[in-house]
């Protein structure tokens, strides 16, 4: 998004104007050669723009091509995210890249429209990320209600609200000049952003060669709240809750696996070998934690520095030579530019984070014409869905075990349409761990107890009914 006035200094504008005048005075047919730093900058920014375009186009094409992907409501939000990131790569990045390499804004009065596109596309991308987190939390915490309520119409309404809000806080304030700092705007006649008067002949050139506007404090704070701070707070809450629910489900699956293996070892009367299912469940919890941490970490690292400066810079002092500076110190132009591009770079990473699962990889391979060569190495990823949370390769196995074990116990009905509460997350596992105690190697007493436990005949009629959470609260 747009840096609000940077240092409120005329120096970058004067340097850019001098470069323009030098180019006008240069002989016809000659052009100022780019320096090494400009060439490197142009190359890196071009790669970033091309990668962002290709990644998001591939995501949209995969969903349009695959009926299976179109059937999932979540992918409506993925398409909306990809479209907003495509707009960032088409309507925002190229113009700024040219200005970075040239050293000034060469597109004249297109500046105001570009500013509106910048705010709209960046806000839409962030709001779509927030909607995806809410959608996943709703799907996992209340899966049956989610299946009933999350229709295509509801999904489109949510997407429409995100885009409407993005347009409202971008085009309307920018076109009506509500976003500018009245005291320090470059649009003020004869004045620079720091109040320094322009020479009469340089006024028009100075306004058009530098596209950075001075945001007023009200707009900078309110737009930052809507575009970033409120969405990031929602994302932190939802992904924290998703992780806690994932913990519950993974441990529940691990307990069912141990119980099923215990029953099988009793029937075969073979030597029992403790299964490392507990270690596997810990690994899966770690995998879920890493996945969610990556989602939040990339988003926060890309956008947080910019939005901190976005709220801080309007309070910067103009720093006149005759008086001392007051307020926050202003940041350099280079620092602000780096953080702006960091935020836009998030649009190039979103396709990797949100669309690089097994279903998308298969369609990607078909679109790229390399079904036999692309993505042949199996990659274990975590499914964050309304089904059991597990590795892709183990999902069917876990469901079979869960179904078989539930059928073994009468009245064992789990609450599928109720949110997992905090009271469920700690207590139940102590009871479940008693179903399949592990035997330490070399402990004769423990092995004897285990053999007696296997030899004892269990009557299903004697099993007392369980609570709705599959756990008996009585001794």
Curated annotation (Swiss-Prot):
Tissue: Brain, in the lateral mammillary nuclei, the anterior pretectal nuclei, and several layers of the hippocampus.
Keywords: Cell membrane, Disulfide bond, G-protein coupled receptor, Glycoprotein, Lipoprotein, Membrane, Palmitate, Receptor, Transducer, Transmembrane, Transmembrane helix
Intrachain S-S bonds: 111-211
One GO-annotated biological process of the protein: wound healing
Pfam short name (any one): 7tm_1
SUPFAM superfamilies: Family A G protein-coupled receptor-like
Residue numbers spanned by region Disordered: 415-443
GO CC terms: axon; brush border membrane; ciliary membrane; cilium; dendrite; dendritic spine; glutamatergic synapse; neuronal cell body
Topological domain spans for side Extracellular: 1-38, 103-111, 180-215, 318-335
Transmembrane segments: 39-64, 76-102, 112-134, 154-179, 216-240, 290-317, 336-357
Gene3D superfamilies hit by this protein: Rhodopsin 7-helix transmembrane proteins (1.20.1070.10)
Compartments where located: Cell membrane
Membrane topology qualifier: Multi-pass membrane protein
Main localisation: membrane
Protein name in the entry: D(1B) dopamine receptor
Annotated organism of origin: Rattus norvegicus (Rat)
